[in-house]
């Protein structure tokens, strides 16, 4: 796996895009909440609520589902306005496989790029070569094999996918439990069986061996998709997530500022039921949402880019 990307050819210049640096940048977000925002005003609400970063996009996932059509990278002017409005890191999404959208976002100076299944895929066979960029990438995964393939391509952070835009946390739960269970299975295998496991996972043996030895991914593992309440966020943290992405669940609720702050606090105090009970009071109505079990196969965003 490459470990030395830099935008400066001088051997004495600091390396700005190595795997170590990019993964370290993602580590800085650990334990926090990343919120989808569509305006500078929403970005300020997220920052004031304690978000560690914001995801700039033109439509939250629930609106993408409702309105349909082709979803693409956001307008650079909109991304710039959000970057100007807040002091916390700003992420933005590109379509799966759309390396030119990624080049544009890197040139804008975003802090992280999310190669996202929420947008309409640009390439159904290939993902972006993330080693070719100095900016760190976030990618989604529904299982361990998918996570390892994205890491092999250069992802610096993995988020379990869930079903974005539904407000239904069930798929996020399934994906996080699945990834953690598969990691524990690798730990139980004798070394000579890891070769077959690597073949089954369609991932490099050395990466599989590392996970079997350490019991965790070599990058940060966040969760996403359907998280709408403080209890949802706390449950995902207790299941092994190292942080939380929240999309439609905040700004499609009755009181976005109050709910955003509550979800941030729940992520921090995820193992304290008394605090969770206190911050769950008086939040107003959560987003109405969609039962993920009723989605047709074509409407399941998590199936994209596997």
UniProtKB/Swiss-Prot annotation:
D-ribose 5-phosphate binds at residues 36, 165, 226, 247-248. Pathway: Cofactor biosynthesis; pyridoxal 5'-phosphate biosynthesis. D-glyceraldehyde 3-phosphate binds at residue 177. The active site is at residue 93. One of its GO terms (molecular function) is pyridoxal 5'-phosphate synthase (glutamine hydrolysing) activity. It catalyses: aldehydo-D-ribose 5-phosphate + D-glyceraldehyde 3-phosphate + L-glutamine = pyridoxal 5'-phosphate + L-glutamate + phosphate + 3 H2O + H(+). It comes from the Bacteria. Pfam families: SOR_SNZ. CDD domains: pdxS (cd04727). Disulfide bonds: none annotated. It is an enzyme of class 4 (lyase). One of its GO terms (biological process) is pyridoxine biosynthetic process. PANTHER family: PYRIDOXAL 5'-PHOSPHATE SYNTHASE SUBUNIT SNZ1-RELATED. In the presence of PdxT, forms a dodecamer of heterodimers. Belongs to the PdxS/SNZ family. HAMAP family: PdxS. Catalyzes the formation of pyridoxal 5'-phosphate from ribose 5-phosphate (RBP), glyceraldehyde 3-phosphate (G3P) and ammonia. The ammonia is provided by the PdxT subunit. Can also use ribulose 5-phosphate and dihydroxyacetone phosphate as substrates, resulting from enzyme-catalyzed isomerization of RBP and G3P, respectively. This is Pyridoxal 5'-phosphate synthase subunit PdxS. It comes from Salinispora tropica (strain ATCC BAA-916 / DSM 44818 / JCM 13857 / NBRC 105044 / CNB-440).
């Amino acid at each position: 796996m490459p470990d030395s990307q830099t935008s400066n050819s001088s051997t004495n210049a600091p390396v700005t895009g190595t795997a170590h640096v990019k993964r370290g940048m993602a580590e800085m977000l650990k334990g926090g909440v990343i919120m989808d925002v569509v305006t500078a005003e929403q970005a300020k609400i997220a920052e004031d609520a304690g978000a560690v970063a914001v995801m700039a996009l033109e439509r939250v996932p629930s609106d993408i589902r409702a309105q349909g059509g082709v979803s693409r990278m956001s307008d650079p002017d909109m991304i710039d306005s959000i970057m100007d409005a807040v002091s916390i890191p700003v992420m933005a999404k590109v379509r799966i496989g759309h390396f030119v959208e990624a080049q544009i976002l890197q040139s804008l100076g975003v802090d992280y790029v999310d190669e996202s299944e929420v947008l309409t895929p640009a390439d159904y066979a290939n993902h972006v070569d993330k080693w070719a960029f100095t900016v760190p990438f976030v990618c989604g995964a529904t299982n361990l094999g998918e996570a390892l393939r994205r890491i092999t391509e250069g992802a610096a952070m993995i988020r379990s996918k869930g079903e974005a835009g539904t407000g239904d946390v069930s798929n996020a739960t399934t994906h996080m439990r699945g990834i953690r269970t598969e990691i524990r299975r690798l730990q139980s295998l004798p070394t000579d069986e890891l070769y077959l496991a690597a073949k089954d996972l369609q991932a490099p043996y050395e990466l599989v061996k590392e996970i079997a030895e350490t019991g965790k991914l070599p990058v940060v593992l966040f969760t996403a998709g359907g998280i709408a309440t403080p209890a949802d966020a706390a449950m995902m943290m207790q299941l092994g997530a190292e942080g939380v992405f929240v999309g439609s669940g905040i700004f499609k609720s009755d009181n976005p500022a109050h709910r955003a702050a509550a979800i941030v606090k729940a992520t921090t105090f995820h193992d304290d039921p008394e605090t969770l009970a206190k911050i769950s009071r008086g939040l107003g109505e959560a987003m109405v949402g969609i039962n993920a079990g009723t989605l047709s196969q074509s409407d399941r965003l998590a199936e994209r880019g596997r």
